[in-house]
Amino acid sequence: MAEETRQSKLAAAKRKLKEYWQRNSPGVPAGAKRNRKTNGSIHETATSGGCHSPGDSSSTSSSLHAPQSPCQELAVVPDSRSVKVSQLKNTIKSLKQQKKQVEHQLEEEKKANNEKQKAERGLEVQIQRLNIQKGKLNTDLYHTKRSLRYFEEESKDLAVRLQHSLQRKGELERALSAVTATQKKKAERFSSRSKARMEWKLEQSMREQALLKAQLTQLKESLKEVQLERDEYAEHLKGERARWQQRMRKMSQEVCSLKKEKKHDKYRVETLERSLSKLKHQMAEPLPPEPPAVPSEVELQHLRKELERVAGALQAQVEYNQRISLLNEGQKERLREQEERLQEQQERLREQEERLQQLAEPQNSFKELNNENKSVLQLEQQVKELQEKLGKRLAHPVASAQKEPEAAVPAPGPGGESSGFMDHLEEKADLSELVEKEELGFFQYYRERCHQKVYHPITKPGGSAKDAAPGGGHHQAGPGQGGDEGEAAGAAGDGVAAGGDYKGHSKFLVTAQNPAHEPSPGAPAPQELGAAHKHGDLCEVSLTDSVEPVQGETREGSPHDKPTAQPIVQDHQEHPGLGSNCCVPFFCWAWPPRRRR
């Protein structure tokens, strides 16, 4: 594009230049040219290029029409040449100026052309953008038209539905007005009936609340009594613990004194062994060839006596060590026997746990508690016997240890035999700790078991609170219970009532199972008492809940099928009086007044 404009401009400039030369240089005749050749003016005509000024043309024309003289021709030639040269210079200058102007115009035109091209490109880009925007607007317009059509159709459908819904609403309002009238009549009839029923329920709940308050006061009183007994038992335990600690301190002091004596005897034995080795070394040395002096017989006898004395002391020490080793072996065997007995007792406890789990029934809970109470008493006696035996055995080795160092001259020698007595004392201390742990574990288990068995009838879902009313031997049987079952439940109620006669014994057993820092298992916490007062969940307890399933359970877990339960059942048959009043927990005492009518 720029090249074409440039070429067109150059062509236009060439045309203008040709026109200018044509205007300034008219045509010269051929005769004049020949005359110039003859006159020797070929060079000037060549330089002029056929371009002559008007003066030259007039002179040539005058020379052609009227011949002149040679002198005049020579004078005219240099004037014409200088004029031509000046004219040519002027034309060259003007041409240079025109050339510069033309070049300047070309540059300006180039710049304008470049700007024009840039503007055209920007316009093309804008046109493309506008076309793209136009396409987008067209698509948006198409979508908006479609959406408008869709919304118009939906509005029509909604208008139709609105009409139908208004019609339906009118129908429903008419039906509702008819239904409300009937409902009001029914509500008036029902309110009159429900008011009387609610009043009756309110009176019944007030009665139950009064009963619960009375029971709560009784439970609080029993809780205070049990807490006092627990504090007394805790003080008793503290005194026993202090006595045991004093005995252990005495034992430790005696052990320290024995250790000191043992060290002293060991040092004496070492000194005797050194002296004996020196004497043997002196006796084994060969006599010098020339002894300076022969020892006397008195000195030799003295040395022999000293040697015999040292040998006797060593022999006594060896015998003493053997006796101590035998004693340690005997004590170890006794400790093994005691450990085996403890293991047997633990196995018995496990068997009793399994037996109690198998015999866990709500109707026979009090009998099982009696059996457990017997086993607890037996275990307490066994524990007391073990404690007495341990005390005797702990006192016996100390006395023997105090007597033996006085009787024997030498002390126990080095080795494993001398440390057997200390090991024996440590094993006995561990055994006493083990016995205490077993006592605490069994007490805790028995406490949890009593809590579980007494609260089991409360939480069992099969029974109702109205079916159970033991007290004074009278009982109202439920719909699925016969007269014999009612009498059995009444006997159980009598057993609960008779538990008050053995209040001290049962309370002492319950408090013996609780450490000083733990609350009694049967005494409910303040939160539990508050919950019972608010909700009335524990207002009544059924002791005759579904007797037939319970009998089925007794068949499945009968003591005849399980040999571990036979001794307890046999003991209960031999002592029938204990089944009604020996092991009633203290939290059952508040129940009989509530159940009596």
From Swiss-Prot:
This protein's record includes keyword Protein transport? no
Q: Region (Disordered) spans which residues?
A: 1-80, 96-120, 390-422, 457-498, 549-576
GO cellular component assignments: cis-Golgi network; Golgi cis cisterna; Golgi cisterna membrane
Asked if the keyword Mitochondrion belongs to this entry, the reply reads no
User: Would you say which domain of life the source belongs to?
Assistant: Eukaryota
Disulfide bonds listed in the record: none
Q: Where is the composition biased (Basic and acidic residues)?
A: 100-120, 553-563
Specify residue ranges for compositional bias: Low complexity: 53-70
Extract the InterPro entries matched here: GM130_C, GOLGA_cons_dom, Golgin_A
Pfam families linked to this entry? GM130_C, GOLGA2L5
Provide ranges: composition bias, Gly residues: 470-483
Q: Which residues form a coiled coil?
A: 81-141, 199-255, 296-394
**Biased amino acid composition, Polar residues:** 38-50
Keywords in alphabetical order, please. Answer: Coiled coil
A GO BP term here is: Golgi organization
Q: Which family does it belong to?
A: Belongs to the GOLGA8 family.
Name-wise, this protein is: Golgin subfamily A member 8C
Please name the source species: Homo sapiens (Human)
The gene that this protein is the product of is GOLGA8CP
